């Protein structure tokens, strides 16, 4: 809301100045500055943000006009020797050059003196000049400080806006939250000195008060998010992460993913709770139930996505499903309820590849360290590569051991220079780490398979907010490639492929149903891609697996028909409230007409409608031709445009497309997900659990808000005073 600051007959609204009686003032904006029209006279002009007087010749016989520039309320003109004059500040008595002979200097330097804090009297008495009546006593006890009787300078921006301690504390709390600053920054001397230089009136609070401010921000943003959830038209899916601290405390993060009434995807952190044992399904179930109750969404849970990859995943998931099914109405008997993180499985498979050749990778790391140890050695290696006419333009670099993509890129670059490594070993007695020919074959095989994982991860990263339908494409191609690779005759390639396929095949069996249902909701593919891909993977048994998917899609759709979600205002606006009984609709459609002699025809139509029921939305959707595949296709926008055509099926699509198939989908985090339980930093883990939750959740929420309010004008304007 625009901030208002009143002064006598003028009021500042936002960045504008208007009279309190609503009448317009004659004013003019020049550059970034608002200047009253009466002050723009003769030689005064606005240049940039400054009001200056243009140089002019004064004929000695001309009548001198009264000076109306604002600065002359603060300066007097005094004659000095040689016919020159100087401008003298009325407050500090400092003088400035003004005229010499027939030339008059500009007034910009005079204006800077009174507006930028150069005048010591104005600097010391700024507050008193704004608030005390004329005739007040200055802080030095030197008597009355002269105050302009009619007008004074003031900025319209925040620099001179009314100071608000509470608002400033709230902004400080948001800064701490967004930038992960420690709460005790408010006690650091350098910080307090900096704040004092900006606003001496700001009272720096203690750590306990700042904790309260952080929690207040958290509560306010939580209320706003709660209102959004109250109008959410569909269900919500949870992405669950496990955390620990250096004190071995356990935390669970719960992020909700959903599609709003405008068919926009959102993911918001809901809770960050401390639990006794995060790896226990009972503790995790309690955390989920608490979160759903806290957000009033007990009947809206659709799926949960876990990033664990333990051997007891089936038992873990079954126990979790059984516990929550007693308190929540799980769709499709809970078959889709527990989803495993795709990014995690990619990382787990990649780690299997790296582990299979860890000895070779160690030698390559040591070789690169040797080459990079000195400029002379690096230059020698470059000369060898040039002599061998190696065409590669890749640069040797060390990897980050926690990010498998960097290991892949390191191996890929080293593979191009394998001859150079061997030549360096024969020409330098200090180097003996060159991999053998068999080692390089292992590296080649590893790079071949790591490329599959690398490309799959980048395909997911290409989408800003990947919907669940995108993951089927990556998963089925990877399943097919690894399945075929296990039959390769080369033992080096086949042995690595077998380890990879064993792990990924477990993921495929657990998740291929939810992946397939998601791609059916893509109008570019529907059941056709499922049929095609399953024929490649399962061969003659494909029809059996296709039927499983088809039956599940129809069963899930029937659940949406029989048990629609509670209507929300957003859904009603989209035309989803037409749930009149079929018999009533058919009666209205076939009501006998009168007076046209076609009563028998109407009865015939009624009989046809009874004997030949119309297709369901799902059957109509599946029977229609596929939507053309284009690069810029937006699946959420397609369903938004077809909501009225498929009112029930669109509800099903909204929930399915919002399933978080991956805990992470962007940045380097996708290459390091699932490397173990994540560690909470010492700063946060030392805080109380409720403050930790406030810091983590509020940071997630605030990043979706505008960073700063619109910056106001900093123009100097004239304000009348009594």
Curated annotation (Swiss-Prot):
InterPro entries hit by this protein: hAT-like_transposase_RNase-H, HATC_C_dom, RNaseH-like_sf, Znf_BED, ZnF_BED_domain_contain, Znf_C2H2_sf
Domain of life of the native organism: Eukaryota
SUPFAM superfamilies tied to this protein: beta-beta-alpha zinc fingers (SSF57667), Ribonuclease H-like (SSF53098)
Cell compartment(s), UniProt: Nucleus
Chain positions recorded as Zn(2+) binding sites: 89, 92, 113, 119
HATC (Hobo-Ac-Tam3) domain as annotated region, ranges: 617-702
Transmembrane segments: none
ZnF region ranges: BED-type: 66-126
GO MF annotation: an example: zinc ion binding
Disruption phenotype annotation: Reduced plant size and amount of seeds.
SMART domains hit by this protein: ZnF_BED
Function recorded in the entry: Transposase-like protein that is essential for plant growth and development. May regulate global gene expression by recruiting other cellular factors.
Quaternary structure annotation from Swiss-Prot or TrEMBL: Homodimer.
Name under which the protein is recorded: Zinc finger BED domain-containing protein RICESLEEPER 1
Lineage: Eukaryota, Viridiplantae, Streptophyta, Embryophyta, Tracheophyta
């Amino acid at each position: 809301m625009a901030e208002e600051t009143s002064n006598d007959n003028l009021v500042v609204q936002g960045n504008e100045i208007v009279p309190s009686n609503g009448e317009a003032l004659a004013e003019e904006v020049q550059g970034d500055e608002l200047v009253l029209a009466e002050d723009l006279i003769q030689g005064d002009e606005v240049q940039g943000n400054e009001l200056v007087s243009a140089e002019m010749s004064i004929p000695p016989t001309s009548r001198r006009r009264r000076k109306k520039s604002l600065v002359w309320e603060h300066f007097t003109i005094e004659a000095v020797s040689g016919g020159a004059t100087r401008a003298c500040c009325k407050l500090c008595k400092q003088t400035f050059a003004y005229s010499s002979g027939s030339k008059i200097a500009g007034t910009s330097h005079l204006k800077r003196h009174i507006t930028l804090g150069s005048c010591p009297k104005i600097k010391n008495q700024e507050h008193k000049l704004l608030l005390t009546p004329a005739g007040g006593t200055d802080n030095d006890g030197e008597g009355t400080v002269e105050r302009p009787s009619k007008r004074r300078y003031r900025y319209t921006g925040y620099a001179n806006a009314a100071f608000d301690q509470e608002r400033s504390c709230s902004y400080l709390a948001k800064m701490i939250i967004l930038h992960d600053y420690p709460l005790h920054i408010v006690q650091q001397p350098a910080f307090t000195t900096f704040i004092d230089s900006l606003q001496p009136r700001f009272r720096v609070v203690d750590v306990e008060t700042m904790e309260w401010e952080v929690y207040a921000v958290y509560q306010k943003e939580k209320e706003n998010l709660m209102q959004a959830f109250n109008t959410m038209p569909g269900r919500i899916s949870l992405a669950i992460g496990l955390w620990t601290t250096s004190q071995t405390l356990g935390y669970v993060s719960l992020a909700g993913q959903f599609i709003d009434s405008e068919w926009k995807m959102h993911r918001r952190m809901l809770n960050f709770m401390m639990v006794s044992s995060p790896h226990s399904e009972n503790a995790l179930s309690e955390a989920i139930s608490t979160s759903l109750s806290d957000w009033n969404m007990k009947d809206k849970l659709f799926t949960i996505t876990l990033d664990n990859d333990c051997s007891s995943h089936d038992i873990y998931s079954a126990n979790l499903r059984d516990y929550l099914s007693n308190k929540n109405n799980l769709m499709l008997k809970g078959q889709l309820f527990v989803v495993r993180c795709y990014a995690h499985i990619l990382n787990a498979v990649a780690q299997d590849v790296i582990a299979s050749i860890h000895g070779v990778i160690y030698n390559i790391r040591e070789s690169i360290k040797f080459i990079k140890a000195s400029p002379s050695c690096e230059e020698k290696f470059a000369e060898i590569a040039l002599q061998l006419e190696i065409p590669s333009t890749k640069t040797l670099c060390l990897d980050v051991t926690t990010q498998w993509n960097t290991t892949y890129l390191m191996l890929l670059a080293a593979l191009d220079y394998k001859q150079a490594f061997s030549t360096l070993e024969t020409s330098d007695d200090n180097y003996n780490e060159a991999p053998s020919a068999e080692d390089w074959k292992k590296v080649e095989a590893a790079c071949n398979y790591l490329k599959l994982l690398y490309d799959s991860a980048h395909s997911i990263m290409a989408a800003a907010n990947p919907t669940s339908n995108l993951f089927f494409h990556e998963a089925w191609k990877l399943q097919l490639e690894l399945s075929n690779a296990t039959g390769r005759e080369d033992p080096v390639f086949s042995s690595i492929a077998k380890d990879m396929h064993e792990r990924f095949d477990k993921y495929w069996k657990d998740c291929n149903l939810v992946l397939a249902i998601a791609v059916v909701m893509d109008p570019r593919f529907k059941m056709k891609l499922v049929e095609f891909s399953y024929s490649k993977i399962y061969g003659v048994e494909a029809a059996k697996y296709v039927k499983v998917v088809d039956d599940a899609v129809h069963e899930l759709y029937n659940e949406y028909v029989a048990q629609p979600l509670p209507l929300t205002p957003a859904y009603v606006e989209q035309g989803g409230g037409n749930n009149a009984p079929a018999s009533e609709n058919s009666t209205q459609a076939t009501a006998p007409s009168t007076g046209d002699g076609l009563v028998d025809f109407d009865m015939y139509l009624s009989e046809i409608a009874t004997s030949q029921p119309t297709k369901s939305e799902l059957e109509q959707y599946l029977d229609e031709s596929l939507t053309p595949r284009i690069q810029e296709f937006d699946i959420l926008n397609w369903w938004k445009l077809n909501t009225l055509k498929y009112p029930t099926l669109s509800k099903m699509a909204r929930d399915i497309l919002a399933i978080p198939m991956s805990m992470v989908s962007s940045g380097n985090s996708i290459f390091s997900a699932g490397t173990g339980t994540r560690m909470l930093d010492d700063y946060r883990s030392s805080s109380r659990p409720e403050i930790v939750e406030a810091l983590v959740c509020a940071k997630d929420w605030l990043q979706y808000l505008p960073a700063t309010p619109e910056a106001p004008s900093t123009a100097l304007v004239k304000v009348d005073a009594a």
